[in-house]
Amino acid sequence: MIYPSINELMKKVDSRYTLAVEAAKRARQLVDGATKMAKCDSDKEVTIAINEIAEDKITYVRTKSGIK
């Protein structure tokens, strides 16, 4: 079974699109050198970002211009 599950992640966001954007933006920050905030054995930035979302380490703010 995949952890975290999509059902668990969907409780953290309002849509799958938001989840994809939030994970992609955080993964980009990690690639650019940001410190990871979740305990994760993976070296893959997208996996780390997904785990951070699941552990409520990061969140998003919806503005008129997009997700911040």
UniProtKB/Swiss-Prot annotation:
InterPro entries: DNA-dir_RNA_pol_omega (IPR003716), Pol_omega/Rpo6/RPB6 (IPR006110), RPB6/omega-like_sf (IPR036161)
GO cellular component assignments: DNA-directed RNA polymerase complex
Family per similarity comment: Belongs to the RNA polymerase subunit omega family.
Protein name: DNA-directed RNA polymerase subunit omega
GO BP: any one term: DNA-templated transcription
EC number: 2.7.7.6
PANTHER family: DNA-DIRECTED RNA POLYMERASE SUBUNIT OMEGA
Keywords annotated in UniProt: DNA-directed RNA polymerase, Nucleotidyltransferase, Transcription, Transferase
Substrates-to-products reaction catalysed: RNA(n) + a ribonucleoside 5'-triphosphate = RNA(n+1) + diphosphate
Gene Ontology MF terms in the entry: DNA binding; DNA-directed RNA polymerase activity
Top class in the EC scheme: transferase
Intrachain S-S bonds: none
Keyword Cytoplasm: no
Biological role: Promotes RNA polymerase assembly. Latches the N- and C-terminal regions of the beta' subunit thereby facilitating its interaction with the beta and alpha subunits.
Subunit-level organization: The RNAP catalytic core consists of 2 alpha, 1 beta, 1 beta' and 1 omega subunit. When a sigma factor is associated with the core the holoenzyme is formed, which can initiate transcription.
